[in-house]
Structure formats: structure tokens, C-alpha cells
Amino acid sequence: MKAIVHITLKESVLDPEGEVISRSLNGLGFKDVIKVRKGKYIEIDIKNNDKVAAKEDVEKMCKKLLSNTIIENYSIKIV
């Protein structure tokens, strides 16, 4: 079983790296780009075959280590 975790900055938090990427893309001719927000994508292979228990464990991982819940949001998908 695999957990896929997406971590992004909360909308209220400035994303200077995303702003630089956005400006750079505009400079390269991609004029339709309005805004970029950069985040993290994490895949975790899990031995547990119980989807509910696996998601609970990954939720704990996110709260304890993978994300800074003060400035970041995360989503978890078990596949």
C-alpha cells in the first residue's frame, strides 16, 4: 500500500519561491501564468493493508514530522 501526501503553504502564507518561479516563467514567455505556489509531494510505502489504520498513521506522520501545520496544509491519499 502507498500513501501520497501533498503539502502546500496555506494561502495566507507568502510563497517567495513560487513568486520567483512565476516571474521566471513569465520571463520565458509563458505570459498566461498568473500565480505559482510551490509545495512538496511525498510517497510512503506502507506494510499495513488496513487503509483506515494506514491513513491514521500517515496523519500522525504529517503532524509530527512531515508538515509544519502552522504554515502548511496537507492532503493524504491511500492507494
Question: Which residues make up each language-model segment?
Answer:
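Short glycine-/aliphatic-rich beta-strand segments at the starts of folded cytosolic domains
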Residues: 1-11, 40-43
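Solvent-exposed beta-strand sheet faces enriched in polar/charged residues
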Residues: 6, 36, 45, 77-79
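A generic structural motif
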Residues: 9, 48-50
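Short amphipathic alpha-helix segments
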Residues: 12-28
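Short, conserved charged micro-motifs
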Residues: 14-16, 50-56
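Short amphipathic alpha-helical segments enriched in hydrophobics
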Residues: 28-29, 69
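N-terminal glycine-rich anion-binding loops that anchor highly charged ligand groups
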Residues: 31-37
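C-terminal structural segments of small proteins and small subunits
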Residues: 55-79
